[in-house]
C-alpha cells in the first residue's frame, strides 16, 4: 500500500482550515463540606447570588452564601452522592423555572419538573424565580371581585382580583377546603389557578389533585408540590416557583389565583437552611430576613394597570397557628403584609359552623370595591348583625327575660349563622348568594325554623332556577339587584309551597 504525500498534505491543510481556536473558560470549584442539603465549595470566586451550580454527579445547587473563602450552596436534589473534593461548576444562569400554557393541568415540583407521570412539559420558555414586583405606577387599585363561591367570604370579607388575603387558623380547621372550593368556583371565569403545596403529605396532595380532576378544575389549574419528604431547599423554593408561573400569565393580561398552602412550613424550611448556612438566628431562631422572605413573595401579587395589560395575580397565603395564637412571629408578619385575613376558628369548626370563619377577627382591607352592587346592598349590615349576635348570645345564656328587640336580634343571628354554613365542594354562584342573603336580610326567614334553613335555601334556589330564571340572570348580567318587588313576589310565592318540618 503506497502512501501519497499529496493526500496527506491535503488532509492536514483541511484540518488547519477547519481548526477553531475557541477557549472555553468554566469556573470550577471544589466541595469542601457537604451534609443536610448544604454544600460549601472553594474556588467559585465569580459566582452570582442565586446562581445555579452543577455538581459532578449532575445534581444542581443554588449559591446562597457568598463568603470570603467559600460559597454556601443549597442542594436542589439528593445530596448523599456528593462527596468532599467533588467538582462543582458554574452554569452562569440564575435559578429559573419553565412557564407557559403547557403547564396547565400538570403537577410539577419546585423546579418545574413534572411529577405526575404524564411525560415531559413541552415548553421552552423560562423565567427567573426571583423577580421585581410591579412598581407603583404599573398597578391599579383592586376593583374586580374574585368570587370564591363561599357565602361567608363573598358577603363578609370579599376578595378582589389582585388582592392578597391571608387564610389563617389552626390545623384541621378547613383551610385547604376553602382553597379547593375557591378553585372550583373559578370554572368559566377565565382564571388560571396555581395551587402550591408546601410540606404536605403526598397522600394529601394526591387527594387534592383527584378532587380537582373529578370536578374538571384541573383544566385551568397548575399544582406545584414540595412534599414533606423532600429536602428543605425545595420547600423554600416552591412558593417562588408558583408565583413565577403565575406572573407569566399576569403579564400577558390574564387573571391568576395563587394559593400557598402553607407559608408556615416554608418559613420553617428557610429557618433550617439559614441555621445550616450559619446565618445568625433571631426571634424564635428565624433569620433576620424572614419578613423579607414573605414580603418579596406576596408583593408580586398585583392588579396591573391597563397600560401593562390589566392582568392580575391574587394571592391566598395560608398560615397555620398554634392553639389560635395569631400574635406569634410569622402570623403577625404575614398579617402586616397582606390586605386582610380570614380567621378560621377550631371552636366554630367543631360546633358545626363550617366554613369556620370568625367574622369578628376576619377583615378585608379592599372591602366593598371587590363586591358587585347587589352583594354590597344585601350584605351591608350582615357583618355588624353577626357581631352583635355573638355579643348578645353570650349574655342571653344568663337570663331568659329578654325584650322583644333583643329576642328578634337573636333569632335573626341564629338564622344568619345557619345561612352562612356551606357544604364541602359546593361553591355557590354570586347571583344565588344574593338571592339567599336578600331573603335573610329582608326578614323572609324570620318565621322559618332554624332546623329548616338549609332545606329552605336548597329548595328556594332550585325553585328560582325553574320558575324565576330571569331574576338570577339579571343579577349575573347587570351586577345590580333586580327591579323592586321581583324578589319579594318570588319569595312570597315560594313560601306558600314550602312546608316547615315542625
From Swiss-Prot:
ATP binds at residues 169-176. It is an enzyme of class 7 (translocase). Its EC number is 7.1.2.2. Keywords: ATP synthesis, ATP-binding, Cell membrane, CF(1), Hydrogen ion transport, Ion transport, Membrane, Nucleotide-binding, Translocase, Transport. Gene3D superfamilies: 2.40.30.20, ATP synthase alpha/beta chain, C-terminal domain, P-loop containing nucleotide triphosphate hydrolases. It is found in: Cell membrane. InterPro entries: ATP_synth_asu-like_sf (IPR023366), ATP_synth_asu_C (IPR000793), ATP_synth_asu_C_sf (IPR038376), ATP_synth_F1_a_nt-bd_dom (IPR033732), ATP_synth_F1_asu (IPR005294), ATPase_a/bsu_AS (IPR020003), ATPase_F1/V1/A1_a/bsu_N (IPR004100), ATPase_F1/V1/A1_a/bsu_N_sf (IPR036121). It is a peripheral membrane protein. It catalyses: ATP + H2O + 4 H(+)(in) = ADP + phosphate + 5 H(+)(out). The record marks 362 as: Required for activity. Its main location: membrane. One of its GO terms (cellular component) is plasma membrane. GO terms for molecular function: ADP binding; ATP binding; proton-transporting ATP synthase activity, rotational mechanism. Belongs to the ATPase alpha/beta chains family. F-type ATPases have 2 components, CF(1) - the catalytic core - and CF(0) - the membrane proton channel. CF(1) has five subunits: alpha(3), beta(3), gamma(1), delta(1), epsilon(1). CF(0) has three main subunits: a(1), b(2) and c(9-12). The alpha and beta chains form an alternating ring which encloses part of the gamma chain. CF(1) is attached to CF(0) by a central stalk formed by the gamma and epsilon chains, while a peripheral stalk is formed by the delta and b chains. Produces ATP from ADP in the presence of a proton gradient across the membrane. The alpha chain is a regulatory subunit. This is ATP synthase subunit alpha.
Amino acid at each position: 500500500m503506497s502512501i501519497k504525500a499529496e493526500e496527506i498534505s491535503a488532509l492536514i491543510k483541511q484540518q488547519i482550515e477547519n481548526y477553531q481556536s475557541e477557549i472555553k473558560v468554566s469556573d470550577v470549584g471544589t466541595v469542601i463540606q457537604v451534609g443536610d442539603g448544604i454544600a460549601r465549595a472553594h474556588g467559585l470566586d465569580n459566582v452570582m447570588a442565586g446562581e445555579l451550580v452543577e455538581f459532578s454527579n449532575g445534581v444542581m445547587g443554588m449559591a446562597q452564601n457568598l463568603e470570603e473563602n467559600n460559597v454556601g450552596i443549597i442542594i436542589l436534589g439528593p445530596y448523599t452522592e456528593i462527596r468532599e473534593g467533588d467538582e462543582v461548576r458554574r452554569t452562569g444562569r440564575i435559578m429559573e423555572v419553565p412557564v407557559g400554557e403547557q403547564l396547565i393541568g400538570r403537577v410539577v415540583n419546585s423546579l418545574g419538573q413534572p411529577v405526575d407521570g404524564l411525560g415531559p412539559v413541552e415548553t421552552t420558555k423560562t423565567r427567573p424565580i426571583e423577580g421585581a414586583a410591579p412598581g407603583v405606577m404599573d398597578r391599579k387599585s383592586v376593583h374586580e371581585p374574585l368570587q370564591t363561591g363561599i357565602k361567608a367570604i363573598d358577603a363578609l370579607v370579599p376578595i378582589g382580583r389582585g388582592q392578597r388575603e391571608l387564610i389563617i387558623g389552626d390545623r384541621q380547621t378547613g383551610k385547604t377546603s376553602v382553597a379547593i372550593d375557591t378553585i372550583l368556583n373559578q370554572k368559566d371565569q377565565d382564571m388560571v389557578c396555581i395551587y402550591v403545596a408546601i410540606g404536605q403529605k403526598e397522600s394529601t396532595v394526591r387527594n387534592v389533585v383527584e378532587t380537582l380532576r373529578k370536578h374538571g378544575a384541573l383544566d385551568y389549574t397548575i399544582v406545584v408540590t414540595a412534599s414533606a419528604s423532600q429536602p428543605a431547599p425545595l420547600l423554600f423554593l416552591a412558593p417562588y416557583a408558583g408565583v413565577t408561573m403565575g406572573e407569566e400569565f399576569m403579564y400577558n393580561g390574564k387573571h391568576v389565583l395563587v394559593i400557598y398552602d402553607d407559608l408556615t412550613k416554608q418559613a420553617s424550611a428557610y429557618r433550617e437552611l439559614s441555621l445550616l448556612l450559619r446565618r445568625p438566628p433571631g426571634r424564635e431562631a428565624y433569620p433576620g430576613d424572614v419578613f423579607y422572605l414573605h414580603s418579596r413573595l406576596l408583593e408580586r401579587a398585583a392588579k396591573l394597570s391597563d397600560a401593562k395589560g390589566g392582568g392580575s395575580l391574587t394571592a391566598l397565603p395560608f398560615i397555620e397557628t398554634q392553639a389560635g395564637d395569631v400574635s406569634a412571629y410569622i402570623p403577625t408578619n404575614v398579617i402586616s403584609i397582606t390586605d386582610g385575613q380570614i380567621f378560621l376558628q377550631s371552636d366554630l369548626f367543631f360546633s358545626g359552623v363550617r366554613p369556620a370563619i370568625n367574622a369578628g377577627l376576619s377583615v378585608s382591607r379592599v372591602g366593598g370595591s371587590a363586591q358587585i352592587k347587589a352583594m354590597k346592598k344585601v350584605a351591608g349590615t350582615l357583618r355588624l348583625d353577626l357581631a352583635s349576635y355573638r355579643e348578645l348570645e353570650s349574655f342571653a345564656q344568663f337570663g331568659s327575660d329578654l325584650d322583644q328587640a333583643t329576642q328578634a336580634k337573636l333569632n335573626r343571628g341564629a338564622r344568619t349563622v345557619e345561612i352562612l354554613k356551606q357544604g364541602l365542594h359546593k361553591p355557590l354562584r354570586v347571583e344565588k348568594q344574593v338571592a339567599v342573603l336578600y331573603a335573610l336580610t329582608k326578614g323572609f326567614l324570620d318565621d322559618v325554623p332554624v332546623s329548616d334553613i338549609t332545606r329552605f335555601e336548597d329548595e328556594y334556589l332550585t325553585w328560582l332556577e325553574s320558575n324565576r330564571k330571569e331574576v338570577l340572570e339579571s343579577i349575573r348580567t347587570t351586577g345590580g339587584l333586580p327591579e323592586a318587588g321581583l324578589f319579594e313576589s318570588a319569595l312570597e310565592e315560594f313560601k306558600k309551597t314550602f312546608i316547615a318540618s315542625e
